[in-house]
Amino acid sequence: MDKPHKRLLAWKKSMDLVVEIYELVKAFPRDEVYGLTSQIRRASVSVPSNISDGAAGRSVTQFRNSLSIAIGSLNELSTQLEIAYRVGYLGRSKLDDVESRVDQCLALT
């Protein structure tokens, strides 16, 4: 069965972002595993999940709605990364690096 979302650059880049996020949060304190770590992971996973849901081809309106949700998740992720920086879990250079990938995904969505 054809999976049209796997051909989308936005889906591919957002999948790469998920992998990067999962690696990044491994360094967060263990007491954040059910807090900020979980929130960041869920926001990142939501992006390619919504892109794939929208690409399922039911309607253009539904695809746009799914992309809108993915954009919301990217903005949520950006805020959560900023929080991680402000509480000392991320350095400035790492934040900037990950934010540039978030921005790439936003531009493609």
Description of each model-found segment:
Residues 1-109:
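Amphipathic alpha-helical assembly/interaction segments
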